[in-house]
A protein has these predicted regions:
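Extracellular low-complexity, Gly/Ser/Thr-rich intrinsically disordered linkers
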Residues: 314-412
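Post-cleavage N-terminal segment of exported redox proteins
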Residues: 1-62, 153, 161-232, 236, ...
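Short glycine/threonine-rich turn/loop motifs
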Residues: 38-147, 212-353
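Periplasmic c-type cytochrome electron-transfer domains
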Residues: 100-205, 326-335, 393-398
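Compositionally biased, low-complexity linear motifs
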Residues: 5, 152-155, 342-345
Length: 412
């Protein structure tokens, strides 16, 4: 089960580490990602304008182009707001899309920051699922990741790739698109769509706004600033395997090569987050989002031990988030941290009780998958009436530390 693999998986990740991820990212950039077509034939060379290649500059325009949606009012930037760490700027559990912007989604919007070193999905030597994009790791490149938002009925809601290209032909930058990818590129909708994917991928890889590494914590690691007393206490609790133990999944130290910490090990965990009635789909009691084994991901549906596991996100910019976890159940960072340490000591705080007053713990999972939830690792290895791994004041300190992971810190 996933919860038994944490100690092993970190040793595995430290071995393969960031060099593997960086090599994978570089290789994908060279071959144009996995968007299909012959994207490798498109040269990607830097230009002086903003330091972006011509392909990435196109990607920047596409990223903010609302006309490529069925509503004409939604772009990538609508849900991934650059002014909020490329994440949602409201506190809705899920966003609304579709032709009339009234179709609810199924998962909270993740940030697009610090995704450029994400490796393609694989199983580590100990069997730990690792990497991939989206909360279930079902696609292997940033290029592949960009397809569904254009076509999903609850997002930009185009009915086909060809429909996206019809809209692209009316865009102000269409001639630039032809100049970069060839005069006849729009003659084949699949080829043209593949170039859209490539452009979006390159924009996210090349533009340092997606990975600036300029938080207070980055500057602290570089010896440029100091953390205050509460932040230092929070860092110690974050790293302490007997207290917060956050570092078990959210790596906080520089890599052996001096690389900045990404605050994720790219693995998956099953936390048993409460069911969120704010998501319209949950009105159907038969609906369950099982992460690695469905409903969006289908290739692992028979791997019952994986059901309920979601990808460990980076904690960079977590203090800017408006909702937390895959279903957006929690609205504040303090609530989210408190859930980690009181989920098992005080489950009544988070889960409903049945008619007999019995708390329905892990109520967003079918009964047969509740055994998959991580209950062996600190801070989850507690029982009711035991003290939580962190006191309320210690939770406050961890929250203070997490605030140091926000990009764009300016020393006073």
């Amino acid at each position: 089960m996933l919860q038994n693999n944490h100690e092993v998986r970190i040793r595995v990740w430290e071995k393969i580490g960031l060099p593997l991820a960086f090599a994978a990212a570089s290789m994908l950039a060279a071959c144009g990602g996995g968007g299909g077509g012959d994207t490798a034939s498109t040269p990607i060379t830097p230009v002086a304008d903003g330091g972006l290649s011509k392909v990435a500059s196109l990607g920047k325009k596409i990223f903010s182009d609302q006309s490529l949606s069925a509503s004409g009012k939604q772009s990538c930037a609508t849900c991934h707001n650059p002014d909020n760490a490329h994440a949602q700027s409201n506190d809705l559990a899920v966003q609304l899309g579709g032709a009339n912007l009234d179709v609810p989604g199924f998962r909270a919007v993740p940030s697009l920051r610090y995704l450029n070193l994400t490796p393609a999905f694989f199983f580590a030597s100990d069997g730990t699922p690792t990497g991939g994009f989206n909360r279930d790791g079902r696609v292997n490149t940033l290029a592949d990741q960009s397809e569904r938002p254009f076509l999903a009925p609850h997002e930009m809601a185009n009915d086909s790739r060809a429909n996206v290209i019809v809209k692209l032909k009316q865009a102000a930058y269409v001639e630039e698109f032809r100049q970069v990818f060839g005069a006849s590129i729009l003659d084949n909708s699949d080829d043209a769509f593949n170039r859209i994917q490539l452009a979006l991928q390159q924009y996210q890889k090349e533009d340092t706004d997606f990975h600036p590494y300029d938080s207070k914590y980055d500057q602290f690691l570089a010896g440029k600033v100091s953390l205050d007393a509460a932040e230092l206490r929070g860092l110690a609790l974050f790293n302490n395997p007997a207290k917060g133990n956050c570092v078990a999944c959210h790596l906080s130290a520089k890599g052996s090569d001096g690389s900045s910490p990404l605050f994720t090990d790219f693995t998956f965990d099953n936390l048993g987050v409460p069911r969120n009635p704010a998501i319209a789909a949950t009105a159907d009691p038969a609906y369950h989002d099982l992460g690695l084994c469905g409903p969006d991901r289908t290739d692992l549906s028979s791997r019952s031990a994986l059901c309920g596991a979601f990808k460990v996100p980076t904690l960079r910019n977590v203090a800017t988030r408006k909702v937390f976890f895959h279903n957006g159940y929690f609205k504040t960072l303090r609530e989210a941290v408190s859930f980690y340490v009181k989920r098992d000591t005080n489950p009544e705080l988070w889960y409903p009780a049945d008619a007999n007053g019995v708390v329905q713990k892990f109520n967003d999972l079918p009964e047969q998958y509740r055994k998959n939830v991580n209950v062996t690792e600190v801070p989850y290895n507690r029982q009711p009436n035991m003290p939580p791994a962190l006191s309320d004041s210690e939770v406050d300190d961890v929250v203070q530390f997490l605030g140091t992971l926000t990009d764009g810190y300016k020393a006073q």
